[in-house]
Amino acid sequence: DALAEQPYVDGVSPSVNSSVTGRFKDIEASTTVNGVSEDFFYVRGLNFQSGQPFDKQSINEQAQDVVIDDNTKKTFFTDGTDPVGQVILLGSVPSRIIGVIEPQKSMMGNSDSLNVYLPYSTVMSRMLGQSNVRSIIVRIKDEYPSAAAENAILNLLVQRHGAQDVFTQNADSIRETIQQTTATMTLLISAIAVISLIVGGIGVMNIMLVSVTERTQEIGVRMAVGARQSDI
């Protein structure tokens, strides 16, 4: 709540995770369970292809409502059945599907992993048996520099905890690192291509030089008897 009240914060969601076996009828698959709040989908900019997100009441009641991603839909509902309203088993917890989010492309490209989203209160109590939130996702307002907001968040948490027992990750910084790495790899590949062209050119030149050297005597005889350059 303290984070949500900050002027630079546009949205906040707790986040807890667990890996379980998901089951629907006779289909089983490894599934990542994400425990989040009702604001998570706005914070991450996720859109729904069908159904809807859970609400504050679901959080308070530890409801077994689940939102699934497109990969989960394709894995468990291969016959085209509408997932909304169906019940899947996540570990030992039966959960009713209330929404399906649109396919998302991450900074690292497309992923085949299955992700489902339940109220964080449900995941903590029914799956993990814990009371501590492992991480918090914060969306910063567009008009605020992300680096400055990151420092302000860290200072706020250190002040409230009395010690620096947390760390932050900035999505903008990660994106910039990936872009820089991609640019470096592009330059490296271009340099390798140039070197290959130079080596190839030297090889062709050497072959031509050897050919001319081997025919020096023949060329001299032809020129002596009046051969033109075009004849040679």
Q: Which positions does each model-derived feature cover?
A:
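Hydrophobic, regular-secondary-structure patches
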Residues: D1-T32, D39-Y42, T75, M124-S125, ...
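Residue-level detector of beta-strand face positions
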Residues: T21, G85-L89, F167
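A short acidic, helix-capping loop that chelates divalent metal ions and anchors anionic groups
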Residues: T21-K25, K105-G109, R175-Q179
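Mid-to-C-terminal secondary-structure elements
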Residues: D39-F54, Q64-H161
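Internal alpha-helical transmembrane segments of multipass membrane proteins
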Residues: P83, M185-V210
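Peri-transmembrane interface segments
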Residues: P145, E150-I153, Q159-A193
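Interfacial "coupling" helices/loops that link adjacent transmembrane helices in transporter permeases
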Residues: G203-I232
